[in-house]
Amino acid sequence: MDKVKSNKVGLFLVGSRKSGTTSLANFLGSHNEISLCNIKEPNYLNNSLLKSIDSYHSLFDWNKNIQLDASTGYTSDLNNTKNICQAIHTYNSKAKIVYTIRDPLDRIRSHYRMSYERGDLNTSLNEALQSHKLLLDCSRYYSQINVFIHTFGKENVLILKSEELNKLETVKSIIVFLNLSHPFEKQIGLDNAADTDYRMPKSMDKFLTNKFYTIIKFMFPKSIVSFIKSNYYTAINKGLSMKLNIESKEVLKKELIPEMYELQNIVDFDISKWTEKLKLL
């Protein structure tokens, strides 16, 4: 990126949910030229609780060349993507955009599973697809990405395949895209693209994410901490249904296959397997 400081956040990781964005953000933030926002997903340009530009800017280290806002909430609502994109452009017309994509069906299932585990959803996947539009919207990659390409130019939008984040070619493309002066010192560790088969009670979820637990967990061996966590998870044999019915399959094919065809025209890697997988539903 341009080495002249603009005093504006210049890098936005906007999507897609459950496609390795957390891992990628942490990886990018490990580079000494990049400052990752102090809080996860500030969503400042999307009706954030951060009321002023000063409060937003206070979340970054301005001694570094690049400030990174990793907020997948910017692309959660397809109807609002144009507004968010324009808001980013109005804030910084020279911003660079990074967008990770994943097998759309795997992403939907992973997104649904996460929502179920958190207690946000208590219905089957079929019912969730009807009532929670964002499950499908977040897999409409072309419709989302094309807005950013149209606004910022293709040269300022980097599209990455989550399955290939650990590849040397991917890391090289990031270095070139951001015009970094030296390579990264670590690899990308994929975390949030992984799925689990357990559901945690809300009470335990709150405990395991509060500051007290964060402090005391370092007082015990990792084996004990893992044992405690695993014993508070409940296997989700009941309630969680991942099987798609005929209606859901037809909706997914109708909505996502055209997206994949259009997407193939703007990415530099093969996604034909994703398209074929949708056709076989």
Question: Model regions: which residues?
Answer:
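Surface-exposed cleft-lining segments at the edges of enzyme active sites
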Residues: 71-76, 126-136, 243-250
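PAPS-dependent sulfotransferase catalytic core
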Residues: 1-77, 91, 95, 115-120, ...
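The conserved 3'-phosphoadenosine-5'-phosphosulfate
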Residues: 146-250, 254, 269-281
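Conserved phosphate-donor/acceptor-positioning beta-strand/loop module used by diverse small-molecule
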Residues: 91-110
